Amino acid sequence: MPSSTPSTNGIMPEAKKAAKAPPYEPNITEPNTRAELIKYWINLSLDDRTAQKMLWLSEGGAKVSRMSEEVCPVLDRPERYEHSPQVLCKQGLLGNRGYWEVDCEGWVVIGAACESAGRKAKDGPCGLGENDLSWGVGWAGCCYHVWHNGENTEFQAPLCPIIGIYADQPAGIIKFYLVEEGENGSKEVKLVHRFTANLKEMLFPGFWVGRNSYCWIRKMDQ
């Protein structure tokens, strides 16, 4: 993934709320179509306490931008990313499934991180997908790259402005999709990659944002 200054397994000072989703039913068929995925849609908002200082949040916590190197006048906090230009959402997944979609423009990585994934320089790599507690996907100029634990896999597809993410925290499943226009104005999904992991803690949607770029969390009716 785009290189960032390292991250630690820091412990969060406050308990987080799990995102609202349908009651968890184990052993169901894994959703694969967009119609199946949106049954697990969760509403998300960005957590300004985690946002690295070059990131600016707007649209009621739905949009994160980095349009210059201007630093946002915010206080230092234990949960704030120190160097990696990232932000997490307030809502996390624990004991449930969730699906969300993001509009993106520019040099971004969209993914998820476990609650204890590091955020400070002393912690080692903390960019999404740079460590064993986070996963990410991003456009690499000619194809998509998915990252985990510092390793990347290529996926050949044209650039798509909407990314979909599905996570089943108890089952340890994280899937990335391209959300494309289908017939009759409907939307369809194309699987980019499916990760399996042993997820023992809360999983938070997250965003890495490069220069002149933004991510905007979509609403279900968009």
Label each residue range with its predicted role:
Residues 1-222:
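Beta-rich ligand-recognition domains in immune and ubiquitin systems
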